[in-house]
Swiss-Prot record:
The chain crosses the membrane at residues 848-868. Residues 1-19 form the signal peptide. It is a single-pass type I membrane protein. Glycans are attached at N299, N327, N347, N507, N740. The keyword Amino-acid biosynthesis does not apply. InterPro entries: Cadherin-like_dom, Cadherin-like_sf, CLSTN_C, ConA-like_dom_sf. The gene is CLSTN3. It comes from the Eukaryota. Residues 943-956 have a biased composition (Basic and acidic residues). It comes from Pongo abelii (Sumatran orangutan). Keywords: Calcium, Cell adhesion, Cell membrane, Cell projection, Endoplasmic reticulum, Glycoprotein, Golgi apparatus, Membrane, Postsynaptic cell membrane, Repeat, Signal, Synapse, Transmembrane, Transmembrane helix. This is Calsyntenin-3. GO terms for cellular component: cell surface; dendrite; endoplasmic reticulum membrane; Golgi membrane; postsynaptic membrane. Residues 869-956 are cytoplasmic. Interacts (via cadherin domains) with both alpha and beta isoforms of neurexins (NRXN1, NRXN2 and NRXN3). Directly interacts with APBA2. Forms a tripartite complex with APBA2 and APP. Interacts with low affinity with KLC1. Interacts with SLC23A2/SVCT2.
Length: 956
């Protein structure tokens, strides 16, 4: 038995030894795997497939693969064994994959066998293989545009390769689905095209005159043909062709007088179309040549302006108005300017010789000579004459004068744009000196004022009130002196020569003494206001006050003037030049160029304006050109001053007051006021629901008058019976002129309102003793600024009261007869009738005297009867208790008429009317059986008489 068990035991031991030695090999897998997993799926497809091999196969456990292990941080996969015998395995995702989150995953994998038994003892592992898993994309996202709205601008008339680019993106991760394959314009009939990259171009030239804004819709597709969820909008604006020019300016600029300085281009800017510039020069020109004489000046007359500016008197007018005392200008062509001043036209063949002595005020003796101190003053409009030779001078004035030492000579000539003054202090010994100026004003064919002050050896020329020193002083050396003979010629000059034909015009004057003179160097242009003053010079301040322009271009913002900017204004302020190198700085400077007019009552009208620009570019080939800008300044009508004359408009005085030596003042309480009315917009109240209207307010101003006139309403004055009186001494002291005729009385000259009030209050009306005048009307009116503004017509009505005790006087009886003959006219119109001739005053009919006495007695009787009737009526009321219906209470004081202070006022005109009716009956042979209606008319004053006597004073 023991022997049988021993072999069995040995067999089991051998079997156990052989089992331990069975798991000899490790599993084997590929070194690298490539895997693909679809997005939103968890199965990984590997290449090559996942198989693990073990050389211990087919042994159980040792030859079987029990599983796979994955190594890596956060590996979202797991590996499962499908068949232990074959070693087949699978990798799967723990959850659906998201390509957009992570496209690829890399980790390692290792296989292990089942060991040597079911307990997995002595398990062997394979090497680690690398696994690359790529997540395949699914087209789940639609394209999305970067912007919902695309805008662009194009210039008209051009074809663009690319106007703008639209862009869409896709949220998918793969190139197939994340890329946009093409775009599409959805709006039909648009002149645009879009390519696969989103670039938009125009298919035809766009015009600004056509459609100025194009709107259309575009969409996008990815390579999976998925369309964008939201389409994009595109707006393309068509702009006009870019032209370098000034932008932001107004053609019409309104200027209100009194506004001070007004910016001409407050919003202007220069459009250069992106062309770089390194120099800009602009010139602003204000044209005022059509306003009076060249520009807006004070509106007073020349005489009034000289007084206001403090100019000395004593000037002599060399070109006066043609008349009996000044006939040397009769042959010249005369024009009139806007200020009513005379202008003389010299056509190049005419000249005038001013006679010395007499009305001209220029004598030929030493006491009347011009010496070496004088002022020449004149207006001139001169342009370059094409047909005249380049070397030919034109003479304005030529004069030879005699002084204590001999003869001196001077001439003023123009030559092109040069003006020259030749002065020869002494023809016998001194050498002539020529002073030259080169001024553009001389040849611009515009009006300018020239004043030449000679204080030898100093000569100063003022043009429009601005002084200019000579550009050249030339000593002419020895030249042939002119004839030693006093002569003054305007418009040409004489040259001494024999056997020369004269070139004289219609009004040229010959010199009869000595050899014949040749008139040459005729002037071609306009002259006006030509005067000379000897012995005293006009000061600079006076000349500037008289002739300086009151309007022009202005620039005052020098503090903010940018770096590199230059500003230049010509003396007459009609031309302003700006220069700079930076566009923005230049724009700022130009925005501060202003127009200014210092006159309170500026001349209304249009002032043309021109802006010219020259630029320099870095590239001369593509340099731009800036077109000219033209506009105009409109000076509005100023608020007219209202001159109001007021005072007592009606008064009556006894005839003895008018017959006094001083007469009766016509305007004893005259008041003159000057005010300006202007629009004031009413302020809006928040609670007010109606419309807001404009109101006018008046501001009283201090101003001057330049003339007043007292005229007659009705017939002219009869110098034999009546006159207007005014103190001429006070007028002369103030430099005022008086003109007194039978039709009017005028006071001329600029003075303050206070002075005119004082003078007019002294105006008196005087009657000669015995003049039978009963009423007069006088009209007073005043004006200012050379008659530009006039006052109201203030009418004063005057009644002359004649006393009744004058009736018996023969002259008054006769006056009553004359008054009766025109009794059908109202008293104001009777004032101009003259007295009867003296032979009719020599006797008075006795019958007329008798009738007058009877009429007066009848009038007294009627008055007495009236008093008796009133007294009897009073007694009846007191005794009988009054009429029916009246109160019977005797204590009521209102029922009794107290006649203790009864006064009867007799109208003197009524008594005159009664007497005149009686005289008419005697002298005219009227019948005694006249109608009772006629008697009633004769006994009562007419309506006009009532108005004269009873109406309160009017205010006009």
């Amino acid at each position: 038995m023991t022997l049988l068990l021993l072999p069995l035991l040995l067999a089991s031991l051998l079997a156990s030894c052989s089992c331990n030695k069975a798991n000899k090999h490790k599993p084997w897998i590929e070194a690298e795997y490539q895997g693909i997993v679809m997005e939103n799926d968890n199965t990984v497809l590997l290449n090559p497939p996942l198989f693990a091999l073990d050389k211990d196969a087919p042994l159980r456990y040792a030859g079987e693969i029990c599983g796979f292990r994955l190594h890596g941080s956060g590996v979202p996969f797991e590996a499962v064994i499908l068949d232990k015998a074959t070693g087949e395995g699978r990798i799967r995702a723990k959850e659906p994959m998201d390509c957009e989150a992570q496209k690829e995953h890399t980790f390692t994998i290792q296989a292990y066998d089942c060991g040597e038994g079911p307990d997995g003892a002595n398990t062997k592992k394979s090497h680690k293989a690398t696994v690359h898993v790529r997540v395949n994309d699914v087209n789940e996202f639609a394209p999305v545009f970067v912007e919902r709205l695309y805008r662009a601008a194009v210039t008209e008339g051009k074809l663009y390769d690319r106007i703008l680019r639209v862009e869409a993106i896709d949220g998918d991760c793969s190139p197939q689905y994340s890329q946009i394959c093409y775009y599409e314009i959805l709006t039909p009939n648009t002149p645009f095209l879009i390519d696969n990259d989103g670039n938009i171009e125009n298919t035809e030239k766009l015009q600004y005159s056509g459609e100025r804004l194009y709107k259309f819709t575009v969409t996008a597709y990815d390579c999976g043909k998925k369309r964008a969820a939201d389409d994009a909008e595109v707006e393309i604006q068509v702009k006009p062709t870019c032209k370098p020019s000034w932008q932001g300016w107004n053609k019409r600029i309104e200027y209100a007088p009194g506004a001070g300085s007004l910016a001409l281009f407050p919003g202007i800017r220069l459009e250069t179309c992106d062309e770089p510039l390194w120099n800009i020069q602009a010139t602003i020109e204000l044209q005022t040549s059509h306003v009076a004489k060249g520009c807006d000046r004070d509106n007073y007359s020349e005489r009034a302006l000289r007084k206001l500016c403090g100019a000395a008197t004593g000037e002599v007018d060399l070109l006066p108005m043609p008349g009996p005392n000044a006939n040397w200008t009769a042959g010249l062509s005369v024009h009139y300017s806007q200020d009513s001043s005379q202008i003389y036209w010299f056509n190049g063949t005419q000249a005038v010789q001013v006679p010395l002595g007499g009305p001209s005020g220029l004598g030929s003796g030493p006491q009347d000579s011009l010496s070496d101190h004088f002022t020449l003053s004149f207006w001139m409009k001169h342009g370059v004459t094409p047909n005249k030779g380049k070397k030919e001078e034109e003479t304005i004035v030529c004069n030879t004068v005699q002084n204590e030492d001999g003869f001196s000579h001077y001439s003023l000539t123009v030559h092109g744009c040069r003006i020259a003054f030749l002065y020869w202090p002494l023809l016998e010994s001194a050498r002539p000196v020529k002073f030259l100026w080169k001024l553009e004003q001389v040849c611009d064919d515009e009006w300018h004022h020239y004043a030449l002050n000679l204080e030898f050896p100093t000569v100063t020329l003022y043009t429009d009130g601005i002084s200019f020193d000579p550009a050249l002083i030339h000593d002419n050396g020895l030249i042939h002196p002119p004839r030693r003979e006093p002569a003054l010629m305007i418009g040409a000059c004489w040259t001494e020569g024999k056997n020369k034909e004269k070139e004289k015009g219609d009004n040229s004057t010959d010199t009869t003494q000595g050899d014949p003179l040749s008139i040459q160097r005729y002037f071609h242009g306009y002259l006006a206001g030509f005067s000379v003053r000897s012995g005293r010079l006009e000061s600079r301040e006076v000349i500037e006050c008289l002739y300086a322009c009151r309007e022009g271009l202005d620039y005052r913002d020098f503090e903010s003037l940018g770096k590199g900017m230059k500003v230049h204004v010509n003396p007459s302020q009609s031309l302003l030049t700006l220069e700079g190198d930076d566009v923005e700085t230049f724009n700022h400077a130009l925005q501060h160029v202003a127009y200014m007019n210092t006159l309170r009552f500026a001349t209304p009208g249009v002032r043309p304006l021109r802006l010219t620009t020259a630029v320099k570019c870095f590239s001369e080939e593509s340099c731009v050109s800036i077109p000219e800008v033209e506009g105009y300044v409109v000076v509005l009508q100023p608020d007219a001053p209202q001159i109001l004359l007021s005072g007592t408009a009606h008064f009556a005085r006894p005839a003895v007051d008018f017959e006094g030596t001083e007469g009766v003042p016509l305007f004893p309480d005259l008041q003159i006021t000057c005010s300006i009315s202007h629009q004031v917009e009413a302020k809006k109240d928040e609670s007010w629901q109606g419309t807001v209207t404009d109101t006018r307010m008046s501001d009283e101003i201090v101003h001057n008058l330049d003339g007043c006139e007292i005229s007659l309403v009705g017939d002219d004055l009869d110098p034999e019976r009546e006159s207007l009186l005014l103190d001429t001494t006070s007028l002369q002291q103030r430099g005022l002129e008086l003109t007194n005729t039978s039709a009017y009385l005028t006071i001329a000259g600029v003075e303050s309102i206070t002075v005119y009030e004082e003078i007019l209050r002294q105006a008196r009306y005087r009657l000669r003793h015995g003049a039978a005048l009963y009423a007069r009307k006088f009209r007073l009116s005043c004006s200012e600024m050379n008659g530009r503004y006039s006052s109201n017509e203030f009418i004063v009505e005057v009644n002359v009261l004649h006393s009744m005790n004058r009736v018996a006087h023969p002259s008054h009886v006769l006056s009553s007869q004359q008054f009766l003959h025109r009794g059908h006219q109202p008293p104001p119109e009777m004032a101009g009738h003259s007295l009867a001739s003296s032979h009719r005053n020599s006797m008075i009919p006795s019958a007329a005297t008798l009738i007058i006495v009877v009429c007066v007695g009848f009038l007294v009787l009627m008055v007495v009867l009236g008093l008796v009737r009133i007294h009897s009526l009073h007694r009846r009321v007191s005794g009988a208790g009054g009429p029916p219906g009246a109160s019977s209470d005797p204590k009521d004081p209102d029922l009794f008429w107290d006649d203790s202070a009864l006064t009867i006022i007799v109208n003197p005109m009524e008594s005159y009317q009664n007497r005149q009716a009686c005289v008419t009956g005697a002298v005219g042979g009227q019948q005694e059986d006249e109608d009772s209606s006629d008697s009633e008319v004769a006994d009562s004053p007419s309506s006009d008489e009532r108005r004269i006597i009873e109406t309160p004073p009017h205010r006009y």
